[in-house]
């Protein structure tokens, strides 16, 4: 099977112009078919402040009210995405900027508010309990526009996705970029040998959060459960690893987690970052 790379970058790259330029220069040289999924970084908050749109968070998650969904659609789908596209085009990488609404590529449903009931034990244990995050989308993975994605990839386009989906009724939805990346990776794994790469601010998954060099080179499910039992993983990394194992269980060959530039410099070997397999 032909190789496909699905790479996700977050705020540590998006918010740093020099880091983003360096990343895109390396990314543009990758010969394999590739998809880039980017987060929004702090730019939406900065522009929101300038426009008088307050940013609200609950449990570290952005609340996407009516004003905010308009803001992030403009910033993520417009400013951030198109600056990435323009840079890649300048590097002779024929990229196309997309959201989940384009060609109905990534349909989603608005996340409902969950309230406790006497027979809803799952809800009672959830940190999302009784909280309305607004216009946030949960991806409908069964309805991905796979045929359109494959046509774009087969015509040598590099796909660059903003973290936005839609509900099919005209409403844009703010959606977790990690989830978009893993959903695309799984959906395309029947046609391609997919490697999913999560880039973030550390060199990999750390055994000791105080030691930036304590990178765990390989995490299997057995190792993962052991690390959780020993309380060695910080909360922020758990959703990434959960997404990684979900992707592997559903057809993705392997997942790498680590620093963006380190991973791209060593894209053909697995000695950098953390391999989830």
Cite the ranges covered by each PLM segment.
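C-terminal catalytic "cap/lid" subdomain
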Residues: 1-277
């Amino acid at each position: 099977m032909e190789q496909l790379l699905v790479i996700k970058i977050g705020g540590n790259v998006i918010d740093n112009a020099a880091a983003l330029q360096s990343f895109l220069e390396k990314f543009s040289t990758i010969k394999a078919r590739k998809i880039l999924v980017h987060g929004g970084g702090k730019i939406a908050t900065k522009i929101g402040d300038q426009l008088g749109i307050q940013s609200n968070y609950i449990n570290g998650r952005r609340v996407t009210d009516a004003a905010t969904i308009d803001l992030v659609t403009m910033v993520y789908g417009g400013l951030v995405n198109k600056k990435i596209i323009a840079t890649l085009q300048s590097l002779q990488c024929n990229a196309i900027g997309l959201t989940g609404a384009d060609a109905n590529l990534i349909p989603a449903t608005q996340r409902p508010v969950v309230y406790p009931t006497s027979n809803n034990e799952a809800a009672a244990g959830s940190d999302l309990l009784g909280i309305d995050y607004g216009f946030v989308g949960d991806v409908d993975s069964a309805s991905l526009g796979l045929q359109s994605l494959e046509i774009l990839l087969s015509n040598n386009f590099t796909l660059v996705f903003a973290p936005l989906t839609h509900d099919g009724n005209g409403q844009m939805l703010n959606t977790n970029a990690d989830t978009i990346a893993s959903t695309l990776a799984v959906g395309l794994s029947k046609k391609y040998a997919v490697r999913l790469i999560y880039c973030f601010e550390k060199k990999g998954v750390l055994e000791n959060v105080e030691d930036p060099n304590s990178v765990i080179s390989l995490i299997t499910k057995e190792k993962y459960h052991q690390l959780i039992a020993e309380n060695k993983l910080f909360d922020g990394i758990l959703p990434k690893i959960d997404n990684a194992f979900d992707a592997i269980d559903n057809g993705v060959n392997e997942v790498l987690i680590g620093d963006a530039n380190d991973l791209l410099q060593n894209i053909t070997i697995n000695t950098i970052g953390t391999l989830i397999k």
